[in-house]
Amino acid sequence: MRVAGAAKLVVAVAVFLLTFYVISQVFEIKMDASLGNLFARSALDTAARSTKPPRYKCGISKACPEKHFAFKMASGAANVVGPKICLEDNVLMSGVKNNVGRGINVALANGKTGEVLDTKYFDMWGGDVAPFIEFLKAIQDGTIVLMGTYDDGATKLNDEARRLIADLGSTSITNLGFRDNWVFCGGKGIKTKSPFEQHIKNNKDTNKYEGWPEVVEMEGCIPQKQD
């Protein structure tokens, strides 16, 4: 009886050890697989992050050099979507900010710091050009000036207003007509014509929208004003 009991004990211990061994092996395999999957996912995530294109200020296509301000802007779309003006990753004017309107939309910024100074819009269809002229005359030297049209920005413009905008570096302002789309970035005290300007004429044969041309967009890097 004692021999039989001892034999049963030996068998029970052997079964226990075998079961423990099998379970430990299976668990180790699963652990290895889990760790392998974890490392694989980590490697894939790292690769995805490394291949993701970088984002630059205002969403422009490439980084600006030192001592330059990044900007991006778009004219309005017909009389439905307002213009958008972004400077140094700060949206200065947009429909979402509810500070745009029919006519010419203007944002002013400090040419040394990029700090926004003012944002306004002037109705050039049903409004008066006189306040716009006074606004243009009051702009201080060294100020960055960004402008974009919405709906119609030309009907009420007179020669004086156009001349003042031309003095900011605009070339196309003399030809801006009814419902043209136009974006411009210049500055008070600029000595040459600005390279930052886009203009598309209102033409019934080529208009993207009924009665309005397509949106014009522009981005670039504005040199910081030096002392």
UniProtKB/Swiss-Prot annotation:
GO terms for molecular function: carbohydrate binding; cytokine activity. InterPro entries: FAM3, ILEI/PANDER_dom, ILEI_FAM3C. Present in most secretory epithelia (at protein level). Residues 1-24 form the signal peptide. The keyword Disulfide bond applies. GO terms for cellular component: extracellular exosome; extracellular region; extracellular space; Golgi apparatus; platelet dense granule lumen. Disulfide bonds join C58-C86, C64-C221. GO terms for biological process: epidermal cell differentiation; ERK1 and ERK2 cascade; gene expression; inflammatory response; keratinocyte proliferation; neutrophil differentiation; phosphatidylinositol 3-kinase/protein kinase B signal transduction. Keywords: Cytoplasmic vesicle, Developmental protein, Disulfide bond, Lectin, Oncogene, Secreted, Signal. Residues 67-225 form the GG-type lectin domain. It comes from the Eukaryota. It is found in: Secreted; Cytoplasmic vesicle. May be involved in retinal laminar formation. Promotes epithelial to mesenchymal transition. Up-regulation and/or mislocalization in breast cancer and liver carcinoma cells is strongly correlated with metastasis formation and survival. Belongs to the FAM3 family. This is Protein FAM3C. It comes from Homo sapiens (Human). The lineage of its organism: Eukaryota, Metazoa, Chordata, Craniata, Vertebrata. The gene is FAM3C.
